Design a protein with these regions (language model features):
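PRPP-associated nucleotide enzymes
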Residues: 1-137
């Protein structure tokens, strides 16, 4: 990614693109090992996880189904409202399937906690989360 046009907007890069790609590759190997012989679907959380899901899936050595959800716990501002809403639901049934949620940034955890419970209530066999970054408060 070319950061030269951002001028003074960025003080420093905390994690480089190369570091992220290396870690996603390692995680893909681990996921393949953990879910070997098991039915797995990746669920990307829109819109932030689009690039993470694309990059992660490219590191996988087998075909894995993908689906998308858009959920929000934010109102008009940048502070969580505490209420999670589904803005775009899954296109496919997850009954009896292992689900790996792909998220770009873990903030408060409210949305992912709610989403995990929601997917389990729909009959997912298991739900795990892969997040690229976690914000520390």
């Amino acid at each position: 990614m070319d950061l030269s046009n951002l001028g003074n907007d960025i003080e420093r890069v905390v994690v480089s693109e190369e570091q992220i790609q290396t870690r996603l590759k390692e995680l893909a190997k681990q996921v393949e090992k953990d879910y070997e012989g098991k039915d797995l679907v990746l669920v990307g959380v829109l819109k932030g996880a689009v690039m993470a899901m694309a990059d992660f899936s490219r590191h996988l050595q087998r075909h894995i189904d993908m689906d998308w959800m858009a959920v929000s716990s934010y109102g008009a501002g940048t502070k969580s409202s505490g209420v999670v809403r589904i803005l775009k639901d899954l296109d496919n049934d997850i009954l009896g399937r292992n689900v790996l949620i792909i998220e770009d940034i873990l903030d408060t955890g409210l949305t992912l906690s709610w989403l995990t419970e929601n997917l389990l209530s729909r009959g997912a066999k298991s739900v795990a989360v892969l997040t690229v970054l976690r914000l520390l408060s």
